Amino acid sequence: MIAHFLCILSYNVNTFVILNVYTKLTMFCTTNSLPMDLLLKQGSLKQEVESFCYQIVSESHDQKVGILQSEDEHLQPSVSKNSEGELSRVKFISNSNKITTFSKKPKRRKYDESYLSFGFTYFGNRDAPHAQCVLCKKILSNSSLAPSKLRRHLETKHAAYKDKDISFFKQHLDSPENNKPPTPKIVNTDNESATEASYNVSYHIALSGEAHTIGELLIKPCAKDVVMRMFDEQYSKKIDAVQLSNSTVARRIKDLAADIEEELVCRLKICDGFSLQLDESADVSGLAVLLVFVRYRFNKSIEEDLLLCESLQSNATGEEIFNCINSFMQKHEIEWEKCVDVCSDASRAMDGKIAEAVTLIKYVAPESTSSHCLLYRHALAVKTMPTSLKNVLDQAVQIINYIKARPHQSRLLKILCEEMGAQHTALLLNTEVRWLSRGKVLVRLFELRRELLVFMDSAFRLSDCLTNSSWLLRLAYLADIFTKLNEVNLSMQGKNVTVFTVFDKMSSLLRKLEFWASSVEEENFDCFPTLSDFLTEINSTVDKNICSAIVQHLRGLRSTLLKYFPVTNDIHAWVRNPFTVTVKPASLVARDYESLIDLTSDSQVKQSFSELSLNDFWSSLIQEYPSVARRAVRVLLPFATMHLCETGFSYYAATKTKYRKRLDAAPHMRIRLSNITPNIKRICDKKTQKHCSH
């Protein structure tokens, strides 16, 4: 039988079919008790016949069989442990010279230039090429290099070009865009993309201060509807993989806040110095909340950021405040020696003796200074006024509160204002906390004086004030002066406001006050538009007593502002404008003054001074003029106002409401009050597993 089989392999190899080979090999292995799985272990019989060349050797005495791979020597048939006993009768390499081979190689199609008429060029090896469409760049297998298959692709995928001749495709092939090498494109998996999208949505939820449930209840359904209308339902279903449950959004926000905090700590560790701004207030649940902001130089600018937002567990004393800040510093290994200034308001918990926070900070940071909010100084200064004007202000507030404290009265006033065609339909509430809006409150009251005269009950004791022209003249003046003071106050708020900015505004206000007082003495009221229009309306003049009270108020206001903002010889004037310095400033040593001379002699630096803000100008010179630039930045680092803390508590109150009393608002404040954008890609890379489950 063996001789018969070898004869068939020798003389009839060209006429064999795979079925005959398989049948005879099976019979041979069965007769000689050989494991058939050795021949078929690597896959199907078709794959074995195409990949291997079997060599069967027959010896008349022991009938040993050898199997030898012809080309793919790295593919060795694997043998199970159960066949080890029979492996002695199988040789993979035979030393016998009596070897007859049988092989079948896969067919390789060649590329023909005529295939370009179907819009196809070749890709890869010229001997074994793949077909590539010149229109859509799709790559087909070697077996697709047939005119019928190429024509089918052109007619089905690019029917608009099926009648084009070969010159069209040749021109398209030779275009510069097609000659560019293919760029590998890294595509995220669905889980990775869904996780990143979840972080992005959570980031915007935290920025808006909305509840976590808005992600699953509103954002995801809206996103699905938009995608379904703009694309199709298949893409809309992919949005289901984005995790936006309540707990998931909460975890995402904590991860984002942690990433921002990590970046901030790294910046503070490498910066030259920083200043602090701190304040404390109570939230809706009664907890004392501490907000601390930090101001530091990073790259070529001065940045402001939230350092920490913590709830004080015990009494909100200075010692407790200091311990909270100090714990954060020690935990993150931030050096206190870099602190140059601490800004606070004038409350007892924020400033005081050794036991208070500012003093304790100055104890661990000996070179640090302390400063008070300049807006608070301004608020104290404007409270001083003559008795006649103070009485009018108090009576105006009583009229407003009489209506605003009674909802029914407010509704009736609204109806009356609408019927009379008034521009406004409600009064503005005045409180001591909202002193910044006092000008708007008085202006609104004066504008609705006619409607209030009709509305007010004659039994109300202050109803006669609305018919008293002297009272209305004083009210018009107060509305004008408080509007002007509010405008000055608002101009001193915002980010990156320096001490120079505040004192410049105060200097301007002092000059205006003297000008206004002189104008009133000359009975010229053009500086006060509301008062001037009212005088024109009633065709009257201002009584001398009223003029005297106005002049007294303006001069007294100027004197009070000079007390809180004294005009002194500024030793840091060279920081404000280094190009006006002609004599060595007392605050600079000789070496720094020489550097300042070099700086002011540079024409490019002079041009940048007119283009950049003061903070950015000095920060950009750190590399070129390090000594004098660092001294200037140190002068610019202290906070001038408590604007950031006031804004922060407003955001805190809007985030942690009575409906969300159990919320940990610290991560939300970190995201909402920070200028640092979290690195979502870095956060996702830290996740070892990215599941689409909630």
From Swiss-Prot:
Span of zinc fingers (BED-type): 109-165
Which PANTHER family does the UniProt record give? EPM2A-INTERACTING PROTEIN 1 (PTHR45913), LOW QUALITY PROTEIN: ZINC FINGER BED DOMAIN-CONTAINING PROTEIN 5-LIKE (PTHR45913:SF19)
Q: Does the keyword Nucleotide-binding apply?
A: no
What the entry lists under Pfam families is as follows:
zf-BED
> Where, in this chain's numbering, is Zn(2+) bound?
C133, C136, H153, H158
Q: Other remarks on record?
A: May be derived from an ancient transposon that has lost its ability to translocate.
This one is known as Zinc finger BED domain-containing protein 5
Signal peptide residues are none
| Taxonomic source organism | Bos taurus (Bovine)
Q: Which UniProt keywords apply?
A: Metal-binding, Zinc, Zinc-finger
- InterPro entries from the UniProt entry: RNaseH-like_sf (IPR012337), Znf_BED (IPR003656)
Note the superkingdom of the native organism.
Eukaryota
